[in-house]
Amino acid sequence: MTERVATTLGLYPLPDWAKDELSDLKGHQKSDLVDGSEGPEVREAYGRVREELIDDQRAAGLDRVVEGQGRWDDWLAHPLAVHDGVETGGIVRYYDNNNFYRDPRVVDDLAVDGGDVAAELDAATGLLEDDEPLQAVLPGPYTLAQLATDEYYGDESEFLAAIAEFLAGEVAAFPEHETLFLLDPSLVTEPPADDANERVSDAVDTVAAATDADVVLQSYWGAHEEKTYAHLMDADVDAFGFDFVAGDRDTHLYNVTEYGTKDAVSLGLVDGQNTAVESPDTVAERIDWVTEQIPSQTFDTVYATPNTELAYLPVSTYREKLAVLGEAVELAAGTEVSA
């Protein structure tokens, strides 16, 4: 019987009260964004944000709980933006939308330097009940390398390997977690060159090997090029995540049919950037439709997720979409998935 899991990619919108309070506490300039050296008042405010974001997931009945990433001012570049070997540069557009992040300029060795993300997850663990499984979230190594500027290593291969080792060190410091989602949208928005595909797969392996949890490599805002997908099949992850909102569904299905997939799958079925709220029935139907298109495999686990981070949405809409996911998985749970 296939397990259906309602979860998200993290990076939630800040509650309205927190936007005002944190703006007053931190300041309004680029230099005031999170860099890992926040004072006690700022940390306490983010602690209340974390508690509220976890309560939102609990109320929605999600099957995995993320920390929420309320501190990630620099989106997926956050783990580098707080690193001692990184200097944050100018503002850069975050993919093809109206959000921005500080360019993380890597100027020194990317040794593990304190486990910023691990500390967030430790705090989240303290808020969970015994039966609430934690889901960790990190940028995938290729995406983090693409978002950064290398001013230290001087070689793309060496830089990607260093990013992967840095992320693996972060993961090794994590508290116990049920799943790890590696968010790697650049795999489809800026696909690796043909001669880099194998290195990218190896980098994913490096990060995945650092945990005993199930690892999901989630891409969005497109579909994988054929060669990229074929090489990623060699990566030792438990599931690939596919964007069935903004990605080309025919390309997804072609890749899976031609090259196979893993024993679990993550389906981005709820629009993380559109305020229109899907119905639970519609999302449940999408779960069944996607899994019915590939009659060669029965998935052990199907993760139902938004297609992107949710920080683009108003708080009220984000909460509605969480509830839709929780209810949709319940509706879809009565039938076995063959795919």
Feature annotation, model-predicted:
Residues M1-A339:
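Domain-level signal for soluble alpha/beta catalytic cores
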